[in-house]
């Protein structure tokens, strides 16, 4: 039977030492073309020719996380640019006197006029 110190030492070695080391050293993932490009884009390797046939799961997970963060940041920037463009175009339309309310009233007026003209035409026959 293990003593308390022996048991604690074994647990500490197991939780801190071996599992992380094994995850980093066991290279069991074969990256596809997209993953190879991601490994280059994130800076893990300088070119696709340097990438080995097998890499560790930990390296691929870190690479995917970096790409996910980059993509989210790009989408945030594009959303902000799109909002700025919409604000600018709305202000330009307001300067011209265009508004959604005016457009709605004009559409309803045209619709009602067309309905009245269609309604009166069959009655005249």
UniProtKB/Swiss-Prot annotation:
It is found in: Membrane. Its main location: membrane. GO terms for biological process: cellular response to hypoxia; positive regulation of apoptotic process; positive regulation of release of cytochrome c from mitochondria. PANTHER family: GROWTH AND TRANSFORMATION-DEPENDENT PROTEIN (PTHR13674), UPF0389 PROTEIN CG9231 (PTHR13674:SF5). GO terms for cellular component: cytosol; membrane; mitochondrion. Keywords: Glycoprotein, Membrane, Transmembrane, Transmembrane helix. The chain crosses the membrane at residues 69-88. It is a single-pass membrane protein. This is UPF0389 protein CG9231. Pfam families: DUF1075. Glycans are attached at residue 112. It comes from the Eukaryota. Belongs to the UPF0389 family.
């Amino acid at each position: 039977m293990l003593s308390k110190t022996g048991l604690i030492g074994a647990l500490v070695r197991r939780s801190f030492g071996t599992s992380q080391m094994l995850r980093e050293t066991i290279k069991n993932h074969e990256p596809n073309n997209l993953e190879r490009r991601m490994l280059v884009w994130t800076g893990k390797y300088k070119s696709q020719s340097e990438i080995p046939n097998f890499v560790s799961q930990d390296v691929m997970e870190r690479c995917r996380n970096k790409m996910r963060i980059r993509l989210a940041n790009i989408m945030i920037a594009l959303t902000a640019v799109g909002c700025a463009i919409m604000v600018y175009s709305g202000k330009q339309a307001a300067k011209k006197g265009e508004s959604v309310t005016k457009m709605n009233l004009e559409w309803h007026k045209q619709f009602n006029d067309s309905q009245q003209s269609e309604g009166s035409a069959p009655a005249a026959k």
